[in-house]
Structure formats: C-alpha cells, structure tokens
C-alpha cells in the first residue's frame, strides 16, 4: 500500500491555494451491463513505490476510473455500479457539481457537510466531466441532467411544488432507458421494513448515523486502519491510498498513473464504518476482480461460452452485505431507501415523490438527490416514471440472504465476477490456484453468524423469503 496524503486532485499536482472554493465532482462507474471486471494494471506495477516521483514532475496520463482502464486484449475492468468521486480544484478536466441550495449541508467554503454515506450519487455530464466524458460518455453520465442545477434552484424556490424539466446530452441511451423503465415491487415489503426498523430504533437517519458510525477519524487513525486492513488482505503495495475532504462518497476506487487508487473521504471516515468500506471496495470488488482475470470467463466471449448469468445482483448484494458485516447495528438503510424511492417514482411525479420521502428523510438536499437518482432519464418529471437500476442493491442482498446457507462463499469469491447461481456449474472449470479470498471469510462459521445477525437486525423473515424466492 502506498500512502499519499499529498495531492488530492488526480489530473496534476495542486498549484498554490485556490482563490475560489474547490468544486466537487463525482461520477458513477459506467456499468450499463453486467460483466466481468478484469485486473486492469500491469502486475509489475503491483509493488510499493519506495521512491515516488513527485506528481508535478510526472507525465500526466488521462485519468480513468477503475472500471474503464484498458489493458490490451483483456478489455476493460468493469465493476458493478458504484460511485467514483474525484475532488477538483477547477483545473483542466474538472467539472463543477453545482451549488446546492442554501440550508443544511453547506459550509461557508462551498463544500458539503452532509454525511457522505447518506447520499446516492449522480454522474457528471459530458459538459461537466470534460475531456474524458466527451470522448466516450458512459450511460450514467448521459443520464445526468445537463440543467440539473438550474432546475434544482427552481424547485427549491417553488417550495417543492415545481416538477423539474430536465435536459440531457445527446444521444440518449434509449435501449438502457427501456431496459430500466419498470420498477420492481418484489421486495418492497422488505425495503419498508428495514427503513422503519431504523427509524423505530433511532428516530431519524441522522441519529442513526451518529449512534452507529462512531467518531470521525483523524488522518493518522485512518492510515493505521487502512494499513492494517491491506496487510490482512495481502494487498500491501498494490493499492495507492489518498485522503480528501472533497469527496461526496465514503470512498472511491480508480486507476491513476496505471495504479489502482483508493481515495477516502476524511469527512465521512467514521470509527465503526471505515473497515466496512474497505471490505466493500477491497475485500469484495477488488479481490473478485483480481480473481476474475484468472478465469476462462474473464471476457464477454468466455461468459457467453459458459452461459453465465448477470453478475451484478450478486456483486452489489455481496458488497453491500460486507459493508455492514460485523457492525453491532447492521442496517441496510441505503439499499432499502433506493429500492423504495424507485418503486414510488414509477407511480409519482417528482414533487409527489419528494413529499413522500419526507416521512423517512427530513434533509431536503438528501431527498432531492434521491429523487433525481430515481427520475434519471425523464424530461418531464410531472409524469410517473423511474430509472430502476439502483434496485439491484437490495435485490442482490435479499437473494444472497435467501440462499446464504447453501452458497459456497469462498468459492464464489475465487471464481471472480459470477452469480451465486453459477457457482456449482463453474466449479469444475475454475482456475483456483493462487486466487484470493478476503480475510473475513477465513472463519466461515463466524461469517455465517454475521449473516444471521443481518437477517435479524433488518427483520427479514426466512419463511417470507422462501415464498418470494422458491427453490
């Protein structure tokens, strides 16, 4: 592991302190289809940088997200959807997320004070994302409204009575919009049950976060926890770690200077949540991606040849479970609220959805972002409609928990980016030598006990899951 608390912008080294407040930027991984993330960097680079050249003196290649790094014939590493957030200082290739409306969650310098983990995340537009997006805009970039800031101002000035009229860059990904135009209600009872369990115990989400997240960590404490975690996973020297105060997510993975890089949000690094984030990003996505590169189904042709199912529900479900693994209160709040929001968006206008969410989320800025997330792709939001892709988190969680007693979790990790449903089929064909299983799966009995604890905490009923997902 390489620890880097210096330059936090990834295009070039920081100049003298900016005279204007730093802008914020966040982007989702461009995964509009399920598929295998690959190991996207030369293995010769998976070493500690004992003598690192200062960033200002290095040639600056185009910064790419972890999911887009190309490596010859191997194609690109594509992980299931999650957030790539990069802080910015207004230099080339940087965009401006936009100014949130006055009120909670703003500091005088223009940065957000809202807890990073409480928000969904919206990709930057082609206009905002600059050179990278203009070359090949991903699906999630294309679905971010280009006029979102202006419509947000109108919405808040109307006291939440205006339905935003969104505009998008062209061409719109119509095939993707058609694929995700219908919301599922299969697990709506579970979603509502999880949300209400949190509010019943803590009153509000903000109280839940304060009670279960623990204190914010100092840089030294973060370095110590990250260093120990990387050693546990055998990843020391493979991943560059950087700290930032400008990320909107808890953490982000990307490839910078041909090295896998994990950026951690200083303002969201809480005592009891940091290791969960590391289990999500490193212990799940990273290790499964490394293992996947060794398998004969590491590319699209191989997946077709072996008849593999989509990996995304399993990938995101597993990562989401690992995020809360070993917590005293392992509530699946975010996955449940995203599922609920999309389910309601399919039946409501934007303003109706915003008002409906008030029963669960008081912060207007947070509600706005959940609503925009669910209404992506719509122009006239006075009409019912949704973009349902984010339901994959809870969907994957519930399916894994339903079959938790029969899934071979170490093998599921070793086989790479595959669905739990394909494990038995792939067992004879997997390349298992030198694959990597996260340390928290070594004691499988304890791991399974934690899954039972997650079931109980979130009030998930075994018999009901059996009826919803029969064998």
From Swiss-Prot:
GO terms for biological process: brain development; proteolysis. Its cofactor is Zn(2+). Changing residue 281 to A/Q: Abolished tyrosine carboxypeptidase activity. It is found in: Cytoplasm, Cytoskeleton. It catalyses: C-terminal L-alpha-aminoacyl-L-glutamyl-L-glutamyl-L-tyrosyl-[tubulin] + H2O = C-terminal L-alpha-aminoacyl-L-glutamyl-L-glutamyl-[tubulin] + L-tyrosine; C-terminal L-alpha-aminoacyl-L-glutamyl-L-glutamyl-L-phenylalanyl-[tubulin] + H2O = C-terminal L-alpha-aminoacyl-L-glutamyl-L-glutamyl-[tubulin] + L-phenylalanine. Changing residue 316 to A: Abolished tyrosine carboxypeptidase activity. Metalloprotease with an atypical HExxxH zinc-binding motif instead of HExxH, which interrupts the active site-containing helix without affecting the integrity of the catalytic site arrangement. One of its GO terms (cellular component) is microtubule. One of its GO terms (molecular function) is metallocarboxypeptidase activity. The keyword DNA-binding does not apply. Its main location: cytoplasm. Coiled coil: none annotated. Changing residue 227 to A: Reduced binding to microtubules. Zn(2+) binds at residues 280, 285, 316. Tyrosine carboxypeptidase that removes the C-terminal tyrosine residue of alpha-tubulin, thereby regulating microtubule dynamics and function. Also able to remove the C-terminal phenylalanine residue of alpha-tubulin TUBA8. Recognizes adjacent tubulin dimers along the same protofilament. This is Microtubule-associated tyrosine carboxypeptidase 1. It comes from the Eukaryota. Binds 1 zinc ion per subunit. Changing residue 285 to A: Abolished tyrosine carboxypeptidase activity. Belongs to the peptidase MATCAP family. Keywords: Carboxypeptidase, Cytoplasm, Cytoskeleton, Hydrolase, Metalloprotease, Protease.
